[in-house]
Design a protein with these regions (language model features):
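Bacterial Sec-dependent N-terminal signal peptides
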Residues: 1-25
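Feature recognizes metal-dependent phosphohydrolase scaffolds
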Residues: 20-211
């Protein structure tokens, strides 16, 4: 009887190991799933444009244009909080290195991918309206770094700042962004504070996250 119990225990242990491995593999596969992100815009050497994004259905879209379309509108979808918004792609321009201060200057730092908190502060200070449009007139918004890391909406915040830069300039104001230490870390490839969603997308595209 004791021998039979040993045999049954051994069989149970042997059978349970593959099941455990499969469960671990399933967990790893689940963690590798893409989540809403982007768009990422690449100016190609031949003058074309590549736009990569992940939509709400977690579907990856990868669009290549032979040349940069005029007035191209990009849709940005926050990860969880907030509503989608559109951004018009502009030609890259070098910004002035100095400027006169405005009557009002709002200085922020360290949004760290937290879109909900970021827009809540901007709304409370009358910098944007409910639709994320610039409402700060001729005043200035200055974000002194650390948009990267920790949160799920790094790209959404960057695109919102890009949008506000255009709208502020049209209104006679300014929206400015300065690099922080977390931007410098990411550009060097130090991704220990980045959320897995960004690393998963980079792995899917077979590129390094810093690129």
């Amino acid at each position: 009887m004791r021998t039979l119990l040993y045999i049954l225990f051994a069989c149970f242990w042997i059978c349970s190991v593959p099941a455990g491995v499969r469960a671990g593999d399933h967990k790893a596969e689940k963690e590798k799933k893409l989540s809403v992100d982007g768009p990422y815009v690449f100016h190609l050497p031949d003058g074309g444009l590549r736009v990569i994004a992940v939509n709400k259905e977690r579907k990856l879209t990868d669009t290549v244009y032979a040349e940069v379309p005029e007035n191209l509108l990009l849709t940005v979808i926050p990860h969880k909080y907030g509503h989608p918004f559109q951004v018009r792609l502009q030609k890259p321009e070098r910004q002035p290195w100095n400027m006169m201060p405005a009557e009002k200057i709002l200085v922020l730092s360290d949004p760290h991918g937290d879109f909900h908190s970021f827009i809540s502060i901007l709304r409370a200070q009358k910098v944007i309206d409910e639709e994320y449009n610039w409402s700060f007139g001729k005043n200035q918004l200055v974000v002194i770094g650390d948009v990267f890391d920790r949160g799920e909406d790094v790209t959404a915040i960057f695109w919102l700042l890009y949008k506000l830069q255009q709208e502020a300039l049209a209104a006679g104001g300014r929206s400015l962004f300065l690099l922080g230490n977390h931007e410098e870390m990411e550009l060097r490839g130090n991704v220990r504070y980045a959320k897995d969603k960004y690393k998963n997308l980079a792995d899917t595209l077979k590129v390094k996250y810093k690129d």
